[in-house]
């Protein structure tokens, strides 16, 4: 069974990491499953790729505004990067011919780049599944973006299933985003998708893991970790965190993310050096550190929050408010249940952050873990994998189109 996963990753790494967690669950659930994962992330090669999963690297995007993406590295126009990526995706679909296409968040891809391939797959009997994170944005913003394009109806026309990586009782996407009854009937809530902790067999050798060893508390000082996802817009939070590190009663570790701007990364390195904090640019499987640290300071992105809660780690969130409000809505929803602490980024300073971290360190971790488990499910990847396998089985019996490849006659090498 062949699966093609798509994520645009114009901002951060969240979409690719979520798709990768589902791919890992999928190949674990079926020895017949194989996944081609299309992404524009420049850091995909650093991620832990399981067997029977291959990365199709697309030219990278950068987010210009909501629903607008340009090239991150190539000096080309928006229309040119859209055409290039669209043709690569269409070629992958028409060569690989997946039984099921899983699309993360954007029904027709960034800048509509997936529309042609999606139509070709539909015309040849392939199945398509749309995956949505728990919260997309404020309902009024989503409505303003979707209605002019008739997206709810078009999603119904092109997609056999919609998977929400969250829980209705935490945030009701179907109601908030105005799904039609027909589209609601095709929608399933999977629970939260969180990458599993590594097993001893998964762990790298000492020689390869030395620079990223799991942090341990020392001299009676707990470890507090600050992470801002990909790092494109986390400078202010990390700067404030490092300002608290000099006289804090904890050991401070900060991870800037691979997308941090060079100038900002240098300033953070100087701050870390003065305050005695530890600074990393990128840590593979950073979520595995969450069980070992006393608290995590973060922005409020889906993957960081989900992995932190899955491991019962006290979280202090300073959510992003622009260009989307999904992090604010997530932090507020989970904060109302007492599962995390969150601060208004407009009022962030060293004093308020230090107070919030101190409060988080005072929590009973066993009690917090029990409280989290009473509200949240973290089997979203496994549930999503079962939905994808069901779609693949439903497609079985349909003939995969034949592939005609023109192989050029090789030129004779000159002696």
Task: Place the predicted regions along the sequence by residue.
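Donor-nucleotide binding loops and adjacent catalytic segments primarily
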Residues: 23-25, 177, 192-295
């Amino acid at each position: 069974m062949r699966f093609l996963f798509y994520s645009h990753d114009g901002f951060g790494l969240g979409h690719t990491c979520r798709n990768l967690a589902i791919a890992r669950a999928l190949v674990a659930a079926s020895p017949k499953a194989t996944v081609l994962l299309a992404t524009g992330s420049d850091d995909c090669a650093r991620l832990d790729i399981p067997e029977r999963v291959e990365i199709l690297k697309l030219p990278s995007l950068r987010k210009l505004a909501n629903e607008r993406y340009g090239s991150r590295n190539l000096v080309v126009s928006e229309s040119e990067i859209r055409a290039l990526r669209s043709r690569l995706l269409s070629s992958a679909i028409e060569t690989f011919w997946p039984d099921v296409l899983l699309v993360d968040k954007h029904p027709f891809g960034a800048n509509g780049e997936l529309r042609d391939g999606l139509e070709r797959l539909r015309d040849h009997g392939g199945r398509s599944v749309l995956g949505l994170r728990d919260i997309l944005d404020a309902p009024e913003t989503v409505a303003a973006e979707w209605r002019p394009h008739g997206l709810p109806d078009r999603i119904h026309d092109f997609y056999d299933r919609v998977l929400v990586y969250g829980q209705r009782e935490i945030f009701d996407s179907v109601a908030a985003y105005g799904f039609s009854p027909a589209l609601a009937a095709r929608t399933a809530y999977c629970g939260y998708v969180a990458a599993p902790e590594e097993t001893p067999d998964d762990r790298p050798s000492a020689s390869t893991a030395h620079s990223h060893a799991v942090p341990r508390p020392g001299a009676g000082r707990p470890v507090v970790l600050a992470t801002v996802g990909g790092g494109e817009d986390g400078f202010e939070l990390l700067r404030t965190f490092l300002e608290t590190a000099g006289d804090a009663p904890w050991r401070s570790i900060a991870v800037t993310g691979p997308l941090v701007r060079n100038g900002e990364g240098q300033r953070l390195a100087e701050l870390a050096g003065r305050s005695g904090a530890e600074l990393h640019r990128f840590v593979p499987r950073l979520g595995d550190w969450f069980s070992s640290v006393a608290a995590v300071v973060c922005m409020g992105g889906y993957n960081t929050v989900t992995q932190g809660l899955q491991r019962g780690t006290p979280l202090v969130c300073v959510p992003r408010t622009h260009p989307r409000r999904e992090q604010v809505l997530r932090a507020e929803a989970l904060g109302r249940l007492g599962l995390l602490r969150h601060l208004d980024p407009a009022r962030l300073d060293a004093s308020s952050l230090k107070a919030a971290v101190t409060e988080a360190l005072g929590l009973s971790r066993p009690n917090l873990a029990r409280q989290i488990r009473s509200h949240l499910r973290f089997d979203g990847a496994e549930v999503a994998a079962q939905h994808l396998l069901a779609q693949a089985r439903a497609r079985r019996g349909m003939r995969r189109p034949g592939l005609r490849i023109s192989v050029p006659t090789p030129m004779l090498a000159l002696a």
